[in-house]
């Protein structure tokens, strides 16, 4: 069964909430197992490679590939990890292409930001996992340094990308159960 993704904004955050028809331990595993994560990370039509040392302070490297073959590398590290409950990732997209950064910067300016204030600061992504109705409620909270950066990411399709990723995660969970 597929569910909708609820997307909201709060302060400098994008908040995404999605129910998955799978046990919490399995959903959490899909976020920390590099093989499973590579199967669903990125918008629909994208593929991914993942390397992850899943421990607090451990490094992570994810690269999404568009259907046209453009690479979107993301580096970072893990923050707080509470098995089956909380996963925090500090994600750095500074290695994305110049074209991607120009698009984000344009969205940042359109959202009211001054060009000289644009930055590619890392984004804290906090994921919580809760039992809900025989499945799992996942809440993803991405915290940006400024609301204008949040709005720029939404304008470039962050919400649509996450929804597509979650659709792919549904499929991974269905075949794993």
Summary of predicted features, one role per range:
Residues 1-47:
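Hydrophobic ligand-binding cavity/cleft-lining segments
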Residues 3-4, 109-117, 126-127:
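Short, P/G- and charge-enriched loop/turn segments at secondary-structure junctions
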Residues 18, 49-50, 74-80, 122-131:
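Hydrophobic/aromatic beta-strand elements that line small-molecule binding cavities or substrate pockets
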Residues 23, 81-83, 94-96, 132-134, ...:
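Short coil/turn motifs at secondary-structure junctions
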Residues 27-28, 37, 60, 78, ...:
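Hydrophobic pocket/interface hotspot
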Residues 49-110:
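Glycine-rich portal/gate segments that line the openings of hydrophobic small-molecule binding cavities
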Residues 101-107, 113-118, 143-164:
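A short acidic/glycine-rich loop-to-helix N-cap element
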Residues 173-177:
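Short, highly charged C-terminal tails/helix-capping segments
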């Amino acid at each position: 069964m597929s569910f909708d993704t609820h997307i909201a904004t709060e302060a400098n955050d994008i908040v995404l909430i999605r129910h998955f028809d799978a046990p919490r331990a399995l959903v959490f595993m899909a976020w920390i197992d590099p093989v499973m994560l590579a199967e669903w990370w990125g918008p629909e039509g994208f593929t991914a490679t993942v390397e992850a040392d899943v421990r607090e302070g451990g490094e992570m490297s994810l690269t999404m590939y568009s259907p046209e073959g453009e690479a979107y590398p993301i580096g970072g590290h893990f923050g707080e990890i509470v098995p089956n409950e909380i996963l925090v990732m500090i994600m750095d997209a500074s290695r994305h292409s110049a074209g991607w950064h120009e698009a984000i910067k344009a969205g940042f300016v359109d959202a009211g930001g001054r060009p000289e204030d644009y930055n590619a600061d890392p984004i804290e992504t906090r994921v919580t996992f809760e039992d809900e109705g025989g499945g799992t409620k996942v809440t993803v909270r991405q915290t940006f340094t400024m609301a204008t950066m949040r709005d720029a990411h939404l304008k470039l399709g962050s919400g649509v990308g996450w929804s597509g990723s979650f659709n792919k995660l549904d499929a991974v969970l269905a075949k794993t159960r």
